[in-house]
Amino acid sequence: MSKIIGITMGDPCGVGPEITVRSLAEMSAADREATRIYGNLATLEAAREALGLSVDLQPYVVDLTVEGAPLPWGSLSAVAGDAAFRFIERAVRDAEAGNIGCIVTAPINKEALNMAGHHYDGHTGMLRSLTGSSAAYMLLASERLKVIHVSTHVSLKEAIGRATTERVLATIRAGNAHLKRIGYEHPRIAVAGINPHCGENGLFGTEDDDQIGPAVAAAREEGIDVQGPISADTVFHRAYSGGFDLVVAQYHDQGHIPIKLVAFDTAVNVSVDLPIDRTSVDHGTAFDIAGKGIANHGNLNSAIAYARKLVAGQASRKAAS
């Protein structure tokens, strides 16, 4: 299995190119040799100039054509959306072929993506489609808090409908397997409720009793150390304080808000249950500051470090088999 990680530079008009260049510039020579950047060389060179850096880019870039590159920073366009898709598509194919061990994605713009005819709700849905996977889960990881989501980019109304026993159970299983993979021998998992105070015995909704509770019971029967549903207004604090290794959140904002509160610049977005490995920054394209050389690349550094751990784990498993 390849130890090379592949960074997709994201939307050419956003902060992705500059944070990618800055992260590459800070790498050791050995880490650079184990890195490929899927993007557009002219755009990356423009970002390098904006940053005032002198790092050599050409040896590490899989250079893909972008019409009119470099495009204006901070602009929304179908050209940029299509380019962002093609960067990811090429990286996925190389990952499937074993040429790279993990993909690290810089931010894309969903509106630009859809303008270009690529109708996905984000990276996770796109990767699920490109790999032909039936399921994929978004896990946000920080040093003291990790959260996996039952649903993500859907309306709150739809998210409630998606919190089925089957889907909650599948999310618990996926989270448990991932934590074991990264070194947790006996992961301790908490499942957040979806209603205030988990419905108060049906006073505020029955989903916790009828859908989420049975999923937790089934997971426990499988030997998974899981508790819940636990009221969402306390479960994240308990996990952050060391009581749990992972929280299963029922919908996007339930899981994202606590993570971004405690680890805004360092949290890593991980796609779980795909046939390939992928980590990502946990922020958007930030068009308002793109090209100004002020974007914080700490989040990307965290995603790169997590990817290298996953790649090292692949090598360890292969050696043991």
UniProtKB/Swiss-Prot annotation:
Binding residues for a divalent metal cation: H153, H197, H252
Catalytic activity: 4-O-phospho-D-threonate + NAD(+) = dihydroxyacetone phosphate + CO2 + NADH
Broad enzyme group: oxidoreductase
Function: Catalyzes the NAD-dependent oxidation and subsequent decarboxylation of D-threonate 4-phosphate to produce dihydroxyacetone phosphate (DHAP).
One Gene Ontology MF term: metal ion binding
Cofactor binding note: Binds 1 divalent metal cation per subunit.
Pfam families named in the record: PdxA
Lineage: Bacteria, Pseudomonadati, Pseudomonadota, Alphaproteobacteria, Hyphomicrobiales
NCBIfam families per the UniProt record, alphabetical: pdxA
Self-association state and partner proteins as the record states: Homodimer.
Protein name, UniProt field: Putative D-threonate 4-phosphate dehydrogenase
EC number, as in UniProt: 1.1.1.408
Residue positions binding substrate: H123, T124, K260, N269, R278
Transmembrane segments: none
Gene3D superfamilies from the UniProt entry: Isopropylmalate Dehydrogenase (3.40.718.10)
UniProt keyword terms in alphabetical order: Carbohydrate metabolism, Metal-binding, NAD, Oxidoreductase, Plasmid
Protein family according to the UniProt entry: Belongs to the PdxA family. PdxA2 subfamily.
Names of required cofactors: a divalent metal cation
